[in-house]
Amino acid sequence: MRTLSFNQPRQRSIGMAINNSKVLIGGVAAGVVMNLMDYLSNGVIFAERMRAESNAFKPGLGDMMSQMDGKSIAGLVIMDLVIGGLLVWTYAAMRPRFGPGAKTAIYVALVFWIFGSIIGSGYMQMGMISSGLWLSFGFFYLVALVLASIVGAWLYKEDSATS
């Protein structure tokens, strides 16, 4: 019978190593997809509605948010690239358990969407945006995450040396 002891050294399980170079390649591609989808949602599809609702919450807030400078845009681009990298890294980590392919990439996207939706719900709870806009953003964000995750997963491959 084996006892539980916190003093024993951990035995490392033998598994597949994550192919970091493919995570980087897939992550950049997924980040580019996220950037394009963010531009569509924030700059085109929901721009006027978001501006109006933000101005209703605090006069001038929506106008200020819509006039972003290069530093703000660069920060958002970097954030999307980081999200893309995390999507692909998570896909690589989940791949041995769920298998390669779009199904696992969609699972990854769902995990990120759930956390993102919980965090984003704060804007609705504070009254900054309506529940309708929050739901619209949430659906669009789910589509963006699924597309980005699938693109990143498509580019991610395990090296024969790491499997």
Kindly label every feature range from the protein language model:
Residues R2-S163:
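Juxtamembrane/disordered regions of integral membrane proteins
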